[in-house]
A protein has these predicted regions:
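Phosphodiester-processing cores and adjacent nucleic acid-binding clamps
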Residues: 1-316
Length: 316
C-alpha cells in the first residue's frame, strides 16, 4: 500500500483489544498486522485497567510476515469508580511503567475488590502520575466544567504531559462536539489529540463487537437498542482517512506523532532482576547458603548422616 507523500503521519492512540473483557473485538496481533498493512508508524494499546494485551502485540512484532513494524506504545485505559472520565495512561520510560504497574496492582488488591475488578480514583492516578503521559477521554455527552476540573487536576500532578482526546465517529453532531473539545483544550491549555477510539481492527469485526456488547449488557440484539455503537467506524483507519476527518484541525493529527515521540519505553527493556539476598558481613552468598543448608540438615537429621546423603548435599 503506497501512502501519498502529502499525507501526515498518524499514530492511533488508545486501542482496545479483546483483553478488555467483552469490549474489544480484535486480538492484539490483528492490530499489529493491520497497522503493518496500513503502514501506520505507531499504535498504542490501552486496555481497560490492564496491560495484558500488550504482550501478544509485542510478540507479533517478531512475526516475519509483519513487514512494516509499527512502534508499539504500552499503556492502559483507566476506568474509575469516582465518576472521573476514562484516562489513557502511557508511561514515558521504565520507571514510569513500574509506577503504572503499582497503580493497577493497588486497584486490584483492595479489601473490597472482587476478582476482575479494579477500584481506582483520580487521587490514585495523581499519586502515581510521575512520568506518565495522560490523555483525558470524554463520553459522548459531558459537562464542560467537570472536564476542565479534571484537566486542571492532572496538570497540577507530576505527569509528563496532559492531552484531551478528540474523535469523529459519525454520530450526527461531530462538528459541534469537536468545536467544544477544541475550545476546552484552548481554555485548559492542553493539546488536542486525534483518536478513533478503536474497538476492532477492521469494520468486518463490528458484528462480533455488537455480540460482545449484548453479552456484557445482558440483552438480546433486538432489545439492546442504543447501547450498541451506531455504526462500524471504530476501526483502525489509515492516516489519509484520519487526516480527512480532522481536516479542520490538522494539529490534532500531527499531535499524535509528537505524543508518541515522547515515549521511550518498550517491553524489550524489561529483564528479570534477581533480588539482592541479605548476607552476613564477611560471607559470600554461596557461603551463607551452605551455612543455612547444614543448619537445616542438623534440624531435620539430628546426629550423623550417612555418607550418601552427605555426598548428595555437597554436590547440590
Amino acid at each position: 500500500m503506497n501512502i501519498p507523500m502529502n499525507i501526515p503521519a498518524y499514530a492511533e492512540i488508545g486501542i482496545t483489544t479483546n483483553f478488555s473483557f467483552l469490549r474489544g473485538g480484535s486480538h492484539p496481533q490483528d492490530y499489529v498486522q493491520q497497522a503493518s498493512e496500513l503502514r501506520l508508524p505507531v499504535i498504542g494499546i490501552a486496555d481497560h485497567n490492564t496491560l495484558a494485551g500488550v504482550v501478544r502485540a509485542y510478540k507479533e512484532l517478531g512475526n516475519p510476515d509483519v513487514i512494516h513494524k509499527p512502534k508499539l506504545l504500552i499503556g492502559s485505559r483507566l476506568i474509575f469508580i469516582d465518576d472521573t472520565p476514562d484516562i489513557l495512561v502511557y508511561p514515558r520510560d521504565r520507571a514510569a511503567y513500574g509506577r503504572l504497574c503499582q497503580l493497577l496492582t493497588r486497584g486490584k488488591r483492595g479489601d473490597d475488590t472482587e476478582k476482575g475488578e479494579c477500584h481506582l480514583g483520580l487521587d490514585d492516578l495523581v499519586e502515581f502520575s510521575e512520568g506518565q503521559l495522560l490523555v483525558l477521554t470524554l463520553p459522548h455527552r459531558f459537562e464542560t466544567d467537570k472536564a476542565l476540573g479534571v484537566l486542571d487536576r492532572l496538570q497540577r500532578s507530576r505527569a509528563e504531559g496532559v492531552w484531551l482526546a478528540a474523535s469523529l465517529l459519525y454520530r450526527g453532531d461531530d462538528k459541534r462536539r469537536l468545536g467544544r473539545l477544541h475550545r476546552m483544550a484552548a481554555t485548559a491549555r492542553v493539546p488536542l489529540l486525534a483518536t478513533n477510539e478503536v474497538l476492532y481492527h477492521h469494520p468486518a469485526r463490528r458484528p462480533l463487537q455488537d455480540v460482545l456488547t449484548c453479552v456484557r449488557e445482558k440483552a438480546t440484539v433486538d432489545a439492546i437498542g442504543k447501547r450498541l455503537e451506531a455504526n462500524a467506524e471504530r476501526y483502525l483507519k489509515p492516516a489519509a482517512e484520519m487526516a480527512r476527518l480532522f481536516r479542520e484541525l490538522p494539529e490534532a493529527v500531527a499531535e499524535t506523532m509528537r505524543f508518541s515521540k515522547r515515549i521511550t519505553f518498550s517491553l524489550d527493556q524489561l529483564k528479570y532482576q534477581y533480588p539482592d539476598e541479605p548476607v552476613p558481613p564477611g560471607k559470600t552468598a554461596q557461603q551463607h547458603l551452605e551455612d543455612l543448608t547444614w543448619a537445616g540438615v542438623q534440624q531435620h537429621f539430628p546426629g550423623e548422616i550417612d555418607a550418601t546423603l552427605r555426598a548428595t548435599l555437597r554436590k547440590e
